[in-house]
């Protein structure tokens, strides 16, 4: 299963997403509760529809799958696909145009390909370990540290509140995979979530893409993040475009 194969799979899924899921954008019916996911979160109708769409394409390949809504499907394959069928489902249901679908492919325990697709802008982000990060086919990099204070996405329940005094502005956009993609293309200087809340499915693709764009990615203890193949782990994530910003944030979390 070469890179070209996985890109074609992703493009097929995106095409189906545009046709099947996008008509529900801003429709309250998409927010109907369907079930409780293995991670303990509520699964809305649109989450289930998006997951069913993606799983129908991926499970036929005989690979392992990790998804927020269904948990783990172990087919004893050397390939594992971690998916977030609808990153930012609240935004989607509410008609807020900031959401995405994300997919990360691993061979054994090594990432080999990741995509994040933002339907509202038709931005197609790709991360290819060892080759780089791309937006609609063009290489992207995190932006150099600006002369002014940085701008970050920041999620907290009180921990690290002093961080806001050391940045120019903060945003809480509600779709962390897409926010990591925005870090990769230079729209944000950092993405920080210290709620012990995000799951591997939320950040698998985003961390691959951001890292390939030059981002530094750690947990709140300053350790590398290990993306596990399950849907229930809860993580902190600190992804930034410079060593200086990383040191500042970690020092304020001590």
From Swiss-Prot:
Temperature-activity profile? Optimum temperature is approximately 100 degrees Celsius.
* Known catalytic reactions: beta-D-fructose 1,6-bisphosphate + H2O = beta-D-fructose 6-phosphate + phosphate
Mind listing the GO biological process terms from this record? inositol metabolic process; signal transduction
Q: Where does Mg(2+) 2 bind?
A: 84, 87, 202
Residues annotated as binding substrate: 87-89, 171, 176, 195
In its keyword annotation, does this UniProt entry include Cell membrane?
Answer: no
Annotated binding of Mg(2+) 1, by residue: 68, 84, 86
Cofactor(s) essential for the protein:
Mg(2+)
User: GO molecular function: any one?
Assistant: fructose 1,6-bisphosphate 1-phosphatase activity
Q: What is its EC number?
A: 3.1.3.11
Keyword Hydrolase in record: yes
Q: How is its activity regulated?
A: Inhibited by Li(+), ADP, ATP and glucose-6-phosphate.
Family per record: Belongs to the inositol monophosphatase superfamily. FBPase class 4 family.
Q: How does it assemble?
A: Homodimer.
Instruction: Kindly provide the name given to this protein in its UniProt entry.
Output: Fructose-1,6-bisphosphatase
